[in-house]
Amino acid sequence: MTGHIFKLAALVGAIIVMASGVARAEEVAPPPSSATRSPELVPASFKVPVRSTGPGFKLVPLGPDLAMIDHAAYMSSIPHLQATFTRSKNWPHPGISAAEAMADMKAEQARFIARESFAYAVLTPDGKRERGCVYVSPSPVPGYDAVVRMWVTQAEYDAGFDARLQSWVMEWVRKDWPFRNVAYPGRTIPWATWETKIAATKAKSTVTTQ
């Protein structure tokens, strides 16, 4: 009986030593190498535009202070944006509350500050009305430095502002951003082509990880 007790004690001691060794190894484990991190959208030295002015409008970062006018803008154009921007019934939809709109603005602001993506409101010069939005984001498809998307309200689209905004934004990105190859889904790249590229990228990623 005593022999069994000694053996059990020795086994428990070995387990404790192994566990402490694992803990120490975890404590001193180096951070992931840069090769495993997602590439940065923009270099650390790049000064991100925080205010840009075009003919009859200005671009400013989306944030909580714009929650009300942003909400009013997209809620005025639900069918239009579902058809031309998200291509989905999920956004915008009639049930979006003011609280949800505020949470979205806080999230956009956080991503902007973290330099993960950059969302801008397209405002009238006096800042009282939102004409649309512009988004600069990482590309899910290899070969592109960034994806730029934009929308305008139904009223602005009917007035011809969409085409003018696209032309201005493409020149702004070319001159003021550090990208060489930018994707404009639904603009210079047809939606069907872009969705095919995304599907192919996901399929390739799945095969690679198996």
Placement of each model-derived feature along the sequence:
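Conserved acetyl-CoA pyrophosphate-binding loop and the N-cap/start of the following alpha-helix
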Residues: 160-168
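Intrinsic disorder/low-complexity segments enriched in polar/small residues
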Residues: 8, 27-28
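Bacterial N-terminal signal peptides
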Residues: 9-19
